[in-house]
UniProtKB/Swiss-Prot annotation:
Keyword Glycosyltransferase: no
Purpose of the protein: Possesses microtubule stabilizing properties. Involved in regulating aneuploidy, cell cycling, and cell death in a p53-dependent manner.
Chain intervals with Basic and acidic residues compositional bias: 28-38, 533-545
Entry-annotated residues carrying Phosphoserine: S186, S577, S584
UniProtKB keywords: Apoptosis, Cell cycle, Cytoplasm, Cytoskeleton, Microtubule, Phosphoprotein
Biased composition (Polar residues): 300-309
InterPro entries in the record: CKAP2_C, CKAP2_fam
Protein name: Cytoskeleton-associated protein 2
Length: 664
């Protein structure tokens, strides 16, 4: 349904139905050619005004001191001539045209006007412009704007009057309506520095005179000469109209002022000049305007280009430049004078304090009173000098010490290397010790080198004891020899070589003993063959005695040997113990056999003889509560108890060994 409705609406729009005459609207004025021409004309004028504003802003950036101001009379005549015509046809067709006819200026005419200072002096700022093609221009004026401007001008006109009454140069030390004594003292100059201040003031006569001249000029009128300048950009229809606003009346920078003044002077040589007298109060009012009113003046094609008249700001900026140039010098001079005054004061204070101290010491000495301790000032003054001189002296002394140390180390290294070479060659010990002693006598600091102690260790022969080498190592540590790790490695190497040589010597001695035994056996055989019965009997007697001694030693029971240790170290005993199970069994059999008192286990155990001897000496309280007997015959002493024999598996190997030994 929606698609069909859209299609129906589209067809209705393509083929509109005819409308009756009663429902048709009257034709608008937009379809009329006259109205279209009028709209085109208005659009052209609007675009022209927009185009003229932008070039004027560029022109103000290039030269801000070129401005043009017309008098109050001219403005009033223009307001009388203005005619307002309004035609209101419909809401869509609203037209308002304003025409302004002013007196045209001729090419070589010189304008001169006096602007009087009053409450309702100026209502608008007029700008001159030239046009060749358009016979007239239309512009809109709003009376409300004029009313606001008049009120603002009245408010700003009262401020310059109040400022003129107040003296511009303030009193020395004036701050927030009061005179401060500290500020006066800070600017007051000392007599010792007055000569310098006079010389500086003489150097700046021209700059100060210029500033004073600018201030001494009358505040009512100022004469200014300015050359006429053409617009920066040209259009095919008309030349741009120059405008003035609040932003352009701000003080320009110093560079732009110099450049613009030079440019104006060069252009003034070939262009006519215009002398205009402008009242100063008028310019102050114009500088505070917020909404400028632009007026366009008709001009013919034969007229000269628009003239721009420079305002009072040029003179004001010149005077401000002179002031700016004078102020830095004054401030610099003031700084110098303050610094000089502070130095002079500090010097005077030091002198006075020293004199007072001297007088005090004289008075005390006269009275017989001496200082208990010296003053701190003397100590504090002496210390910095010593500190300042010490670094220089210490630097050169350290340099000399380093040179001496380098020479000593070179000499010591050379002699020690020679000693090591002699040791390797096998030179005698006395000669090497003599050279080392001479070195220590000449250079005592040689003991701090490890190479000296290494030589002493190398001199020690291989057969010497290890204690001598260790003592040398201890002496080197006490002397502070560096690097000690090198000596440690060398001592370890020497000790390892010594141990290896000792092992080799032991093997050689054993071999020597082994060679001696066969020699003795051979000698014994020779003696037996030669028939020496006495010696043989003696030898046999000696052997028999030795054998008898060995038998006695083995048969001695007190000696503990690995073979007899097991027999003498432990004892087999029978432990008698009871358990709750046995007690219950005894109660069951109590009725059958009442003769049995108790039923106990009899277990063979192995006890240490040493522990058994010690426990036998203990009191009865500390002994084992379960009795043990050494044989079965001692069981009768226990009374009418019944015993149950329980074998011990740990003792089976022991019994087996004993049985085997008995059988053998």
């Amino acid at each position: 349904m929606a698609e069909s409705r859209k299609r129906f609406l589209g067809r209705a729009a393509r083929n509109p139905l005819p409308v009756t005459r009663d429902l048709q609207l009257p034709p608008t004025r937009r379809d009329q050619p006259a109205f279209r021409e009028q709209r085109k004309q208005k659009l052209k004028e609007y675009l022209l005004i927009r185009k003229t504003v932008f070039p004027y802003k560029q022109e103000n950036q290039i030269s801000r001191d070129q401005k043009m101001i017309t008098s109050e009379d001219r403005v009033q005549e223009g307001k009388k001539v203005v005619k307002l015509k309004t035609e209101v046809a419909d809401k869509e067709n609203i037209e308002s045209t304003v025409e302004k006819n002013c007196i045209p200026l001729k090419a070589g005419e010189v304008t001169s006007s006096e602007i009087h200072n009053s409450k309702d002096n100026v209502q608008a700022v007029q700008l001159l412009s030239t046009r060749d093609d358009l016979p007239g221009q239309t512009v809109t004026l709003d009376p409300a704007c004029h009313h606001k401007d008049n009120k603002k001008m009245q408010m700003t006109a009262e401020k310059p009057k109040q400022d003129s009454n107040v003296s511009k140069k303030r009193v020395l030390g004036y701050y927030h309506g009061q005179i401060v004594q500290s500020k006066i003292n800070s600017f007051r100059k000392l007599p010792s520095v007055k000569g310098e201040s006079l010389t500086t003031t003489k150097k700046l006569p021209t700059t100060v005179s210029k500033a004073m001249k600018a201030q001494s000029e009358p505040a009512n009128t100022v004469s200014v000469k300015a050359s006429t300048t053409a617009a920066a950009t040209k259009f095919a229809d008309a030349k741009p109209v120059s405008t003035a606003s609040k932003d352009t009346l701000v003080r320009p920078p110093i560079r732009s002022l110099h450049s613009s003044s030079h440019g104006a002077a060069k252009q003034g040589l070939s262009r006519p000049l215009a002398n205009v007298t402008v009242r100063k109060g008028m310019l102050d009012k114009e500088s505070h305007r917020s909404e400028p009113v632009v007026s366009v003046v008709k001009a013919g094609s034969s007229q000269a280009p628009s003239r721009s008249i420079a305002s009072k700001d040029a003179a004001r900026t010149d005077s401000s430049n002179t002031r700016l140039m004078v102020k830095p010098k004054d401030t610099d001079q003031r700084r110098y004078t303050i610094a000089g005054a502070s130095v002079h004061r500090s010097a005077q204070l030091k002198d006075t304090t020293a004199e007072r101290k001297a007088q005090m010491t004289e008075w005390r000495t006269g009275k017989g009173k001496g200082l208990k301790r010296p003053p701190h000032s003397v100590v504090t003054q002496a210390e910095p000098k010593g500190q300042s001189e010490n670094p220089v002296g210490s630097f050169w002394t350290t340099m000399a010490e380093e040179d001496e140390q380098r020479l000593f180390t070179e000499k010591v290294n050379k002699t020690i290397s020679e000693c090591l070479n002699l040791i390797n060659e096998g030179c005698p010990k006395e000669e090497i010790l003599a050279t080392l002693n001479d070195l220590i006598h000449n250079i005592p600091d040689a003991k701090k080198l490890v190479k000296y102690w290494i030589c002493l260790v190398r001199i020690e022969p291989i057969t010497s004891p290890i204690e001598n080498i260790i003592s040398i190592y201890e002496k080197a540590i006490l002397a502070g020899a560096q690097p000690i790790e090198e000596m440690r490695h060398i001592i370890i190497d020497i000790l390892t070589t010594k141990s290896q040589e000792k092992v080799n010597l032991g093997e050689n001695i054993e071999e020597a003993h082994a060679t001696k035994e066969p020699i003795q056996e051979v000698n014994a055989d020779a003696n037996v063959g030669s028939g020496k019965p006495g010696e043989e009997n003696e030898h046999h007697g000696k052997v028999e005695v030795y054998e008898d001694d060995q038998d006695n030693k083995i048969k001695d029971p007190d000696l503990t040997t690995p073979d007899s240790k097991t027999e003498a170290g432990c004892i087999i005993r029978y432990n008698v113990s009871s358990t709750p199970r046995l007690q219950s069994m005894k109660k069951m059999q109590h009725d059958k056999n009442s003769t049995l008192k108790e039923l106990k286990f009899l277990t063979p155990v192995r006890r240490s003889r040493r522990i058994q001897d010690k426990t036998s000496r203990l009191p009865a309280m500390l002994k084992d509560h379960d009795p043990s007997v050494s044989s079965l015959e001692q069981l009768s002493e226990l009374g009418g108890d019944a015993f149950v024999c329980r074998p011990n598996a740990a003792l089976c190997p022991l019994f087996f060994e004993t049985d085997v030994a008995e059988e053998e």
